[in-house]
Amino acid sequence: METLIAISRWLAKQHVVTWCVQQEGELWCANAFYLFDAQKVAFYILTEEKTRHAQMSGPQAAVAGTVNGQPKTVALIRGVQFKGEIRRLEGEESDLARKAYNRRFPVARMLSAPVWEIRLDEIKFTDNTLGFGKKMIWLRDSGTEQA
């Protein structure tokens, strides 16, 4: 649980996620502002259905990605690598996520793009502020944490 708490605290301070999807051997990545839900261990993003990455995702798809800062020194590198599943939200689930997203990013009220959830199943958090190459790993299904 301590690993997930540390990861969640760091993710709550960031705001841009990069995620990648593949379809028929073709890969594509995209960036978006995100809202992180520590209880569900999921990102919520907005993206138009007409985008290449949304078209490749369809209603749901496997996904991998990163969240990282831009430190000027190696000793301060912190970042997350993850894999999971992306899906477009519908109905009440979408409405609730959009309200929370709009609280974090008020400018999003002007956007009509659908809400998507990236459910994280595996997270690797690198935190060089704890020592060079320090890694923490969290896995959803097994509840496993490695520090």
From Swiss-Prot:
Query: By its UniProt entry, which InterPro entries does this protein fall under?
Result: Split_barrel_FMN-bd (IPR012349), UPF0306 (IPR011194)
Per its UniProt record, what Gene3D superfamilies does this chain match?
Answer: Electron Transport, Fmn-binding Protein, Chain A (2.30.110.10)
**Which segments cross the bilayer?**
none
Q: Which GO terms describe its cellular component?
A: cytosol
Protein family membership: Belongs to the UPF0306 family.
Q: What is this protein called?
A: UPF0306 protein YhbP
